[in-house]
């Protein structure tokens, strides 16, 4: 359901909870919809450290309950993790006065409940946080922050769901230290594994904001490869002359494709491949997702080059390995020290380029809907919905206008039928009126009386008057 909707509406991103079935290091416990290939699946980490709450290890540790991957066809899951333990939530009681007010203005501590507020744990708490981050990423493009890290420095763009997803995954931190399994048992993890996926969400490592973050940002949206095309290439050069403090080059490729049948053993339909080479060292390829070979399972691929040196140049390759359709669109994101502007108009393509004039914002009908869905016990809870109701209002208004139009057309048709019937009756009656010759033949013969007031009246007028 999510995959097909996102494929049909490529400015849409669904952010869903991975689930809470991971106790005991239970593998492949991420279930639908968290195992959908196009969504951004979110696992739960701890929220703060032991210094604040006893037993808490901090956001670099995955919560014991957070569902684990891989999916049944071997894809990475969850995609990312975010704080999901002891998150303060509303606990309104609609039948009680002041239901949303905590007692005496106090705030509940971890695991504590009180009037109006309560503390909750679960991937259902993590997903809304990531959905909020996704909303900020969308705003970053819509308000043109990507130009030089300030508002309105670039054209207003309507980003694809693939671009928003790639941006968040590209900045995710792989410094996950382990999984808390309770009773002091910590399971070690590795980058791109099935505990934390691509890592811990970090907006400061995902986007460049002047004076706030120290990472350069490049992106290409709405790119397309056709079956049989040679690889597309993109060039980046590491430039630390302006004080950039990023040590790594991170590149992420993401694409949204049509949904696969339930229970598929290989769900990837269109297989794109990402790899990076360093100029002068073309013999060495950096492959994605921690592998030494191409990835033929995931529709998100990430390459991280540790310690990218100042002045070194890299070529990013995106190629179509195997396509089941004629072509495939994709989004590509890179972060690192690039110097100067983070992006220029000639290196960024907007999915909806016809609406990318610098003087205005994106049309409301092309705004995305970001939904955070939580899967708890098989139920899907909508945690956050960013939707422009104008889209739905326009659809409702259009339907209402069409309904009125049909009703009007029906009335007009009924009137036409009524008008057609009226002259037909008169013509028939005129045919019943005897011709002059027939009247002459019938003269002197007794006239047969006809019923109907109108007919009798006409016959009386037709009889010859007596002298």
Roles of regions detected by a PLM:
Residues 1-90, 169-173, 247-259:
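Catalytic-core segments of hydrolase enzymes
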Residues 32, 84-182:
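Hydrolase catalytic cores
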Residues 118, 123, 187-194, 265, ...:
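Noncatalytic accessory or regulatory domains flanking protease catalytic cores in secreted, cell-surface
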Residues 146-148, 155-159, 176-177, 183, ...:
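Secreted peptidase-domain scaffold signal
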Residues 352-368:
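Extracellular Ser/Thr-rich, low-complexity/disordered mucin-like segments
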Residues 368-381:
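Single-pass type I membrane protein transmembrane segment
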Residues 379-393:
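Single-pass type I membrane-protein transmembrane alpha-helix
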Residues 394-461:
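Cytoplasmic C-terminal tails of single-pass
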